[in-house]
UniProtKB/Swiss-Prot annotation:
Protein encoded by which gene: opd
Binding site for Zn(2+) 2: 169, 201, 230
Signal sequence interval, chain numbering: 1-29
Organism: Brevundimonas diminuta
UniProt protein name: Parathion hydrolase
Organism placement in taxonomy: Bacteria, Pseudomonadati, Pseudomonadota, Alphaproteobacteria, Caulobacterales
Any one of the GO CC terms: plasma membrane
Positions of modified residues (N6-carboxylysine): 169
Similarity comment: Belongs to the metallo-dependent hydrolases superfamily. Phosphotriesterase family.
Post-translational modification, as annotated: Predicted to be exported by the Tat system. The position of the signal peptide cleavage has been experimentally proven.
Disulfide bonds: none
Binding site for Zn(2+) 1: 55, 57, 169, 301
Biotechnology: Has attracted interest because of its potential use in the detoxification of chemical waste and warfare agents and its ability to degrade agricultural pesticides such as parathion.
Length: 365
């Protein structure tokens, strides 16, 4: 276990600034090659990452569920094939990298991620951290032990695969529980030790990002290493700009989530909400107009299998968004372009910002 002194010293490195790129379907030029990002196929240079979706899932489940009951998803092979088809569609639309923020307790299967990544030729960054479904053996751990677990998955590898995590995922909904506070503190310490960034799940309508920020800052973690997720679940621009002004990345990652037309489906409405994707996408432009282009990350929070909700929810979601992970490049980017957002800005949001965030040493200006 590293001491806090070592942890803080390890986090002190600063990097060079990144310039904008001319296109966002692929990397048009170089944004630097000296730093590397862990993916399930091994480290890549930041210039290889390209158009990146920063909050996605191949499968949303619980620890061990896929291995114990693959037939729930048809079969493991069927799930893999669906994921490959979806990622190939996203790749054809310009996506080169996704960040799969499935943690141990979301049923993360990094062998599946590696298989799908190879077949679809899309880079996948795997996550350590914890969500809302940790087993008792995790809930009994101290902050020091949780830090050790996160560091193991970043520095040594996940399980016995040798695949290293490239991001730390944590979650709160409303006021953090005492255990969630420990998880956030452990995430901050692991990030300080490694440079690997932290991304969060929030209930944006309850302004969760404010408490999360306070916990991270109490541990000495720079806001530039944290993305406050699901931030498009609110229209409270003052809440978002206050976080952005402090240096936090703002994750607008629920954009295709809308149960409009399905208002009579209580499960869909509870999960997806009744807000149009256009309303969510306009938050991107609002933050750009406020001068926070460098603080924006966009994604879909989409999946190809989902067992941690009602049984038929994946069928409903596929009807809501048949584009899957291709939704951002196929729908949102053209929409923003029509609203007058320049191509260079769109490239900054989808290529430069994610590369800077995922890089263990590069920092925001």
């Amino acid at each position: 276990m590293q001491t806090r002194r070592v942890v803080l010293k390890s986090a002190a490195a600063a990097g060079t600034l990144l310039g904008g790129l001319a296109g966002c379907a692929s990397v048009a030029g170089s944004i630097g090659t000296g730093d590397r990002i862990n993916t399930v196929r091994g480290p890549i240079t930041i210039s290889e990452a390209g158009f990146t979706l920063t909050h996605e899932h191949i499968c949303g489940s619980s620890a061990g569920f896929l291995r114990a009951w693959p037939e729930f998803f048809g079969s493991r092979k069927a799930l893999a094939e669906k994921a490959v088809r979806g990622l190939r569609r996203a790749r054809a639309a310009g996506v080169r990298t996704i960040v799969d923020v499935s943690t141990f307790d979301i049923g993360r299967d990094v062998s599946l991620l590696a298989e799908v990544s190879r077949a679809a030729d899309v880079h996948i960054v795997a996550a350590t951290g914890l969500w809302f479904d940790p087993p008792l053996s995790m809930r009994l751990r101290s902050v020091e032990e949780l830090t050790q677990f996160f560091l193991r998955e970043i520095q040594y590898g996940i399980e016995d695969t040798g695949i290293r995590a490239g991001i730390i995922k944590v979650a709160t909904t409303g006021k953090a529980t005492p255990f969630q506070e420990l998880v956030l503190k452990a995430a901050a310490r692991a990030s300080l030790a490694t440079g690997v960034p932290v991304t969060t799940h929030t209930a944006a309508s309850q302004r969760d990002g404010e408490q999360q920020a306070a916990i991270f800052e109490s541990e000495g973690l720079s806001p530039s290493r944290v993305c406050i997720g699901h931030s498009d679940d609110t229209d409270d621009l003052s809440y978002l700009t206050a976080l952005a002004a402090r240096g936090y990345l703002i994750g607008l990652d629920h954009i295709p989530h809308s149960a409009i037309g399905l208002e009579d489906n209580a499960s869909a409405s509870a999960l997806l909400g009744i807000r149009s994707w256009q309303t969510r996408a306009l938050l991107i432009k609002a933050l750009i107009d406020q001068g926070y282009m460098k603080q924006i990350l966009v994604s879909n929070d989409w999946l190809f299998g989902f067992s941690s909700y009602v049984t038929n929810i994946m069928d409903v979601m596929d009807r809501v968004n048949p584009d899957g992970m291709a939704f951002i490049p196929l729908r949102v980017i053209p929409f923003l372009r029509e609203k007058g957002v320049p191509q260079e800005t769109l490239a900054g949001i989808t290529v430069t910002n994610p590369a800077r965030f995922l890089s263990p040493t590069l920092r925001a200006s």
